[in-house]
Amino acid sequence: MEGDMVAKVKRETVVACMTCPLCDKLLRDATTISECLHTFCRKCIYEKITEDEIESCPVCDIDLGGTPLEKLRPDHILQDLRAKLFPLKRKKERAPEVVSSISLPAKRKERSISSLVVSTPRVSAQAGTTGKRTKAATRKDVRGSGSFTKRTVKKEEEFGDDHVESASSPETLKKFTQNKRQSSYANPNQSLSNRRNKDVDEPWDSKLHLWKPLNFLVDVANGTKDPKSELGNASHNDVQGSKTKTKDHKRKCKLEEEISNNGDPTTSETATLKRTRRTRRKRSSTFGDSRIPLLPGAASLKQERRNGHVWFSLVASSNQEGEASLPQIPANYLRIRDGNIPVSFIQKYLMRKLDLKSEDEVEITCMGEPVIPTLQLHSLVDLWLETTSKHQRVAASIGSSAKEFVMVLVYSRKLPECNN
């Protein structure tokens, strides 16, 4: 009985639970912040964090750390409830269009295959018969072949073959019927080459290209030939023909240049030598010695480093003693987007993490030297690169640790100055 109970709830109360607080619309791709469990549309919360550069929840202002996008999680349960209670209309409208677009090509394919299979067995089945039936069959074959050859001739005329004769003309039909009658009385195992030798008066060589597409269709219907192989060979031959044409054209251009130079072969040779010398000079001037660094490239790399992110590691000093020692923070690897921020920003961050009264209680050192709080981070990175070994190369593999390539900043409690 308990499972059959139904409770009625007002629509306004359900909509309030499934509304994004940023766009005031129903949730789309519900995304929840793992720290405070507030839910938003995925597009809304991503744009809010990236464009406004906030590091806290827009509703409760809880701190999300340096990488707030990593605290976002997709809420599939809430999204499924929203889809069941308030379904989207776009899916219902697009469904019939997809079905109609897919169903059309299958029908065309079935028609084309059936037409091939039905038209092929008539010729082979009626080849050995005699009498009136053979005459009627030959007439039907002549009509069918005439219509078929009309189609092939029309296709060839579209591609520019103006010399092809249509097989539906009265002269070709008469010749075709005469050949059919002679072949019906002859031996059926006789080859096509012997028939050509007997019928010397008729120019069969001029009409062989009309029967090639018909024979190909018959072979495809019987399953003896693969249509893809023929198409592949044709395309391969076309590509080879175009390559040979381009080579011949280049050779003709070279010959014309040599002829234009008053017929002297030495002038063309000197011209080619001058060209090679010019290219060698250009290469030597542009590339130069590989050991000398290029100044414009170094300046551009330095500018990119100044505009990019700054990675560094914060490590507590090991020389601290007593109650004045500062503990190690959990997230020691940090990234700052703006390299123009001074070092005092890091001191403020440590003050918040370690619950100190002021930022002056923290002292930051790099490579054993104290760092001025007003120094900018990109300048500090340049100093760190200069103090490290310049000419030593460190081999690194993909996927290995990058601890050796990250700037290390050591923090400790600043000791009060002794006044003498």
UniProtKB/Swiss-Prot annotation:
This is E3 ubiquitin protein ligase DRIP2. Interacts with DREB2A. It catalyses: S-ubiquitinyl-[E2 ubiquitin-conjugating enzyme]-L-cysteine + [acceptor protein]-L-lysine = [E2 ubiquitin-conjugating enzyme]-L-cysteine + N(6)-ubiquitinyl-[acceptor protein]-L-lysine. SUPFAM superfamilies: RING/U-box. It comes from Arabidopsis thaliana. PROSITE patterns: ZF_RING_1 (PS00518), ZF_RING_2 (PS50089). One of its GO terms (molecular function) is ubiquitin-protein transferase activity. The gene is DRIP2. PANTHER family: E3 UBIQUITIN PROTEIN LIGASE DRIP1, E3 UBIQUITIN PROTEIN LIGASE DRIP2. A zinc finger (RING-type) spans 20-61. Keywords: Metal-binding, Transferase, Ubl conjugation, Ubl conjugation pathway, Zinc, Zinc-finger. Pathway: Protein modification; protein ubiquitination. Residues 113-123, 166-194, 232-242, 260-273 have a biased composition (Polar residues). E3 ubiquitin-protein ligase that acts as a negative regulator of the response to water stress. Mediates ubiquitination and subsequent proteasomal degradation of the drought-induced transcriptional activator DREB2A. Functionally redundant with DRIP1. Residues 154-165 have a biased composition (Basic and acidic residues). GO terms for biological process: protein autoubiquitination; protein ubiquitination; response to water deprivation. The keyword Transferase applies. Its EC number is 2.3.2.27. Auto-ubiquitinated. Residues 113-201, 226-289 are annotated as: Disordered. It is an enzyme of class 2 (transferase). It comes from the Eukaryota. Residues 244-253, 274-284 have a biased composition (Basic residues). Disruption phenotype: No visible phenotype. Drip1 and drip2 double mutant shows delayed growth and development, but increased tolerance to drought stress, compared to wild-type.
